Amino acid sequence: MIECLLYRNSTAQRRLFYRVEIAMNLFSEVSVMREWGLAGGRPKAVVQCFSNLRDASRAADRHRNRAERRGYLRA
């Protein structure tokens, strides 16, 4: 399992997070799981499945780069 956790402080009261995780699933596929939301709140999540690690890693990097461009910083 590979994980990247990012945070963004938009105001003093709102601490946002964005998490990207790469893991193998039970069907020998590689999953990219993304979660985002308010810290301490209920997160939203999306899971994408890929046939190989290279494609999953590229997708995870795209999502992480997009989050960093939007102001999220590594934890």
Place the predicted regions along the sequence by residue.
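A broad, low-specificity signal for short, low-complexity segments enriched in glycine/proline
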Residues: 7-11, 36-37, 67-70
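Negatively charged, low-complexity tracts enriched in Asp/Glu with abundant Ser/Thr
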Residues: 1-14, 40-41, 51-53
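Intrinsically disordered, low-complexity and often Lys/Arg-enriched segments
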Residues: 1-2, 73-75
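Short aromatic-glycine-(Arg/Gly/Cys) micro-motifs in beta-strand/loop hairpins
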Residues: 20-46, 61-62, 73
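A short, charged, amphipathic alpha-helix used as a generic interaction element across diverse proteins
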Residues: 42-44, 51-69
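Beta-strand residues that line the small-molecule/cofactor-binding core
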Residues: 17
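A general marker of short, structured functional hotspots
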Residues: 3, 13-14, 23, 46, ...
